């Protein structure tokens, strides 16, 4: 079951020749989303061949480097005769602004577009086996982050134990693994608890958008399999980070450490580090898990916690 992210834009507020403004494409099996949609996001989707089958766009805040790609995307989908509905999730109070941005240049489109406000702590998208939750972040304007959280999975089936109990190889194995008891020919009933292990955790993907280190971010990122965190500045620019509502790489690493995240992606890299993000990378060296500076076009697959 695939869960992967493709970084479409990893720059700070000002793009560079190597980095587009913020956007992350997320694919989970047949579902596809965008986290933020900076300028030229649609071109990045074409460039990195993600496909355009996006059902939801999750906007963290209203700054241009996170939303200026929306009008082009929405109207290109219309030019391509899209009929599937689109939901754009935005922080509270931003619905009218985003509606004006999306439709002021090109007018209405021929498919349903729903703009809904995301309240921190709320589930903003539900699916059979995962959900997307909004959480509070700390930026210079109204902002939220988003966590994609999978449900626990069924425990492992102990075939050897099932055979010891006399369960014949065949359909009864599947019945037990699906959580239903089976009756053997001699009348013995075997329950799932006898042959199926404890539930196994699903995966958690967390995207902060722009933020200072913040306790609600730590809570949302608890045991996350991948935390994508603002790392606009190197550690020697901590005052500038605080002034602008951003984080240093070291602060991102501290959040990841406190949360117990397994992997950390550093993004929203300031243009002052154009061509050389080594200071950003070095700044996160205090994190014991996997840490990397995201770059445009990078695809990262998120494994299950028990994949080994």
Curated annotation (Swiss-Prot):
Its cofactor is Zn(2+). The active site is at residue 65. The keyword Secreted does not apply. It is an enzyme of class 3 (hydrolase). It comes from the Archaea. One of its GO terms (molecular function) is 3'-tRNA processing endoribonuclease activity. PANTHER family: ZINC PHOSPHODIESTERASE ELAC PROTEIN 1. Zinc phosphodiesterase, which displays some tRNA 3'-processing endonuclease activity. Probably involved in tRNA maturation, by removing a 3'-trailer from precursor tRNA. Homodimer. This is Ribonuclease Z.
